């Protein structure tokens, strides 16, 4: 064992980690048929691969050839949306206003520049810069984590263990999508021919559990609406898994985030019909109009334009809790209004409110502060998020997974 440590573990690793603990996390992971030494080799190789990957700041993956004209269109839409001053419930909340200003400077500078080539270069590597993630700093969190040998070993082992558990707990069709693909150049753990990422697991899990909750395989001509869709990995997964089903996925988000979602969806689903604000701004947002598209991307305030009962299911994950309380109450009211009878609301959010001193003392409103006892609705699910998969970190942070069903 000592010889193996000396030969395989870099000097910095030996100097900074308690080796007994470091090696302990190897056992029980990797392939069940692997020998102990093979397991160790797999985990160590994965750690070193991620470290090398984190040092790469460029991306060899070329964007689709028509990206620049498409981004020029997105620039025009963004400029028009920013010139519109929404009513107070739809202005950026205190947490996001401060986070965008503080942690997404490079992305916002590219978005404000009007230079399509500059924005293209940012978006082609959006997983490796401040465009997305945990308030724009997910890649920095990952870099800091992999400076600590023991924490990085735990992270890698945890992802591999979750990967192996996934098909036993979730719908196995979604397992392939724990790999987020090539666009945006994600950084992940290489295993079983895939690149495993925490966000990939999260979105694959959401897609699986949402599909179960609404019995997706038995539905046709659905309109699904997500409030705060991020870079649109969840709709990508749902569209590719349920490719035999005809449905429309509507994303409502801040104007700053919609270009990322549009780029990602166009790159991954080039043949899909994507409806954007410039062609839907003035006309009605009736169900029949929405059904002309595979994806529809609209600014958050357009939720008021959706007719009563026009949506079959609404999704919100790790988003509403980041908003001010009056904004949350407004959105919950809108969700009740737009959801059709027999429809669903699927949400995963923090259960308890949390203050952020680094963001000027702004505070999240936890789900315990929301009123989800809606007349005519019943709870189909109310459990700690990741309970079945033992996603310990999120359980400790107090995230809950709730499904509400509106009576027919």
Where are these regions (language model features)?
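Membrane-proximal basic amphipathic "stem/tether" segments
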Residues: 1-85
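Conserved class I S-adenosyl-L-methionine
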Residues: 219-230
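A short SAM/SAH-binding and catalytic strip from SAM-dependent methyltransferases
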Residues: 312-326
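S-adenosyl-L-methionine
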Residues: 264-307
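Conserved Class I S-adenosyl-L-methionine-dependent methyltransferase catalytic core
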Residues: 86-219
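Conserved beta-strand signature within the Rossmann-like core of class I S-adenosyl-L-methionine
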Residues: 341-353
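A short glycine-rich, Lys/Arg-flanked "PGG" loop and its adjoining helix->strand segment in the class I
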Residues: 329-341
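Conserved SAM-binding loop of SAM-dependent methyltransferases across substrates and taxa
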Residues: 231-244
